[in-house]
Amino acid sequence: MLRRFVSTGLIAAAMALAAPPAPQAQQLTRLNISIQPADFSMFPVFLAGEQGWWRQMGIDANISFFPAGPPQVAAAAANAWDVGITGSAPAVLGASRFNLRTIGISNDESQTNILMVRAADLAGIRANPQSLRGQRVLITVNTTVDYVLQNCLRTFNLARNDLQVVNLAQAQILSAFSTGEGRVAGLWAPNIYTAEERMGAVPLCSGSDAGATVPSNIVVREEYLRQNPEMVARFLATVLRGIAWTKTNREAALQSMQRFYAQGGVTISEAAFRAEIDRHPTFGLEEHLRLMDRSAGPSQVDRWFEGLAAFLNQVGTVANPPAPSVYITDSVLRRIAENPQLRAFALNQ
């Protein structure tokens, strides 16, 4: 069920004095923002509410929560939201069907989309990956962790039909794996921490291991971007500020993350919260500009999405997906970089 709340946050006097003034910040403009609950990639949106950054940017943030990516991007077709953060697969789907544009990368989830095994099995499988032939692999098909499975199998010199692939939702995988079902479980965060802490599971192969990058996308409706480029720049600058702030205020960020996850009904250990930060590389403004630079050809981000799009086309999730250059744009990043106030805000200066 779609849950909605309006959050503009409270501004402490010290924050107001420290932050650079936002253009036309005296009058708030409504901005409809979509995210998913208890997901690290969405955390900067929650953090901005707690820190009062939306108001500093002149934004009245109306935040909608969606349970998953597909209904989230489908709602964009009805103009239910203007900007948001979603997974890489929904972002490609949204680009293909609803003209969503990717304007940034919230984080890299390659280390948290993982094939996991029981600790006692790890050494044997690594020594002889062919021992997985005929074994049951529990996976949520046509998702990013399935994309990771495909790439990990390639490194093992195995084909998909060499295994018994069992399609289950993430909660079902945890339940089945805990009772001894399956040799391999494909999981993503925060489920990987449950498997590690309660079942003694360990990573066998991640997206990072197999060269399958799994970003999380900062997106906007194409029409809204065309009509409101300044508002989109303020939004992205605020998200980038959250990324920069989290890097330099780790302990305070951990406390805020706990409140965000609790709001979504997710409880994990303190060690898991720390792992969320450690295993999710994030990118500030300058890193974004380098990752999305096309001056010498396709950007690094373009190359990430070429592999994912090919997989989504192969499994039928997105037929003939558009080229990354069609829906990934650095125009908003460049707008921020060229505006001294927005640049300073994005850099948490």
Each language-model region and where it sits:
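Secondary-structure end/capping motifs
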Residues: 228-319
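Pocket-lining segment of extracytoplasmic ligand-binding domains
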Residues: 121, 172-269
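Sec/Tat signal peptide C-region and signal peptidase I cleavage site
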Residues: 19-25
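Soluble non-cytosolic domains of exported or imported proteins
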Residues: 66-70, 85, 139, 143-144, ...
